[in-house]
């Protein structure tokens, strides 16, 4: 049986905490400046920034692999795997409240995909709030889609899509705490393991997989 997997062999160096803190500070200051320019009667901030954390449960992977085995023959395999794999994700978002009921935001983050590899996704999300008073707790629904890269050798592009809903607690005019549930799908490109051999990309014609998952998260917007 063919069991695919992906392991990143290159170390990915991210911004250190000082640089990240500086970026967040600049965004916060800009957020405060823009919101201060709003009319004093405006019941909600125009510019929003936030952080989001989540727990991901991957349930299914539909895959199609086409490659040359170490012995030289060609292998074409399609299938679907069911299982339970847990991961986590984290996002930074910057957005705009179009009105009290609609928000559009750009999300940049880091997430795991099944038992394959990690990804760096970037997506655009539209959120619909049910209730016109931003100072009150309310329900919401959202959908987002985007692209990104998978952190493996070689790096390949991925596609993501997500729909979900949640409940927003209003802590203040500018600060909201969100409880989120979502269904998500990721189109990615795992590495391939065949008979204890890792198949190099030069011998790989196709390494596609669609991973379906559920996620449960918390978000803080201000």
PLM segments and residue spans:
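Cleavable N-terminal export/targeting peptides
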Residues: 1-45
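Residues embedded in well-ordered secondary-structure elements
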Residues: 25, 29, 40, 83, ...
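Generic domain-boundary/flexible-linker signal
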Residues: 31, 62, 137, 176, ...
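Short glycine/proline- and aromatic-enriched beta-strand/turn motifs that initiate or cap beta-hairpins
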Residues: 36-96, 211-222
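Transmembrane beta-barrel strands of outer-membrane/channel proteins
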Residues: 49-61, 106-110, 143-149, 165, ...
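Flexible, solvent-exposed loop segments that connect beta-strands
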Residues: 59-82, 88, 106-122, 149-155, ...
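Gram-negative (and chloroplast) outer-membrane scaffold detector with strong preference
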Residues: 91-164, 169-177
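A generic hydrophobic-segment detector
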Residues: 156-216, 222
